[in-house]
Amino acid sequence: PMPGCLVMSTYYITSGYAAELSVEQPFDYVIMDEASQAILPMFAASRKIGKRNLWVGDIHQLSPIVILNGNRIKICGYKHLNEGLKLLADNSTSPIYQLTKTYRFGQRAANYTGVFYNDSLVAKESPEYNELPSMCKILSIDGGPTLVLTDMPSGDSTPLFATCMASFIVANIINDNKDKEIAVLTCMKKTTRSLQMAITQKVGTRKNLLVDTVARVQGLTTDI
């Protein structure tokens, strides 16, 4: 580090730097963004290289994706290593602060998301979303989630009716407003590929349309 300079780095590079460091805490401040994606040793590395630390993250986000089998993690007791931020939040004596005002969505969405945060979230603004007339009976004008129930046979990661329904909804949204940013998220890669094929056949390839797994797009902000 150089006095008065800002250094930006990934967890991977920083952890390697900390492992080889002979002089402790060369930085005045270390800020870890997306700290929920850091395993426990990364927090130790952060403390080693910085005199003061600020960890910014959400313990309710998905923990880091690891190669080890889930059963092995459980048997070997590695869960706390993988959920570093949650472990520290539950046991650390350091001051912890939660931001309660959301700028991403309206109050209806904040109420649903707030279930994970003791109903503490408040929306800065609550606009009405009425620019999608063909979806007015499905999507709420106040924003927030909508649950559409459909048959999904157990073990079938590419259910035909659900795939057709998703592509139909996407097509209607684009017909109403072609500039809307849309994300279609799934859990399984096989489901993602099936949806990508069905939606592309329906509306073509678009820069403002993303079909991917939840694990790959944490923190993404879109219209729908």
PLM feature spans:
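Conserved helicase motor core of SF1/SF2 NTP-dependent helicases
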Residues: Y12-S15, V23-I224
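Conserved helicase ATPase core
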Residues: P1-C5, C76
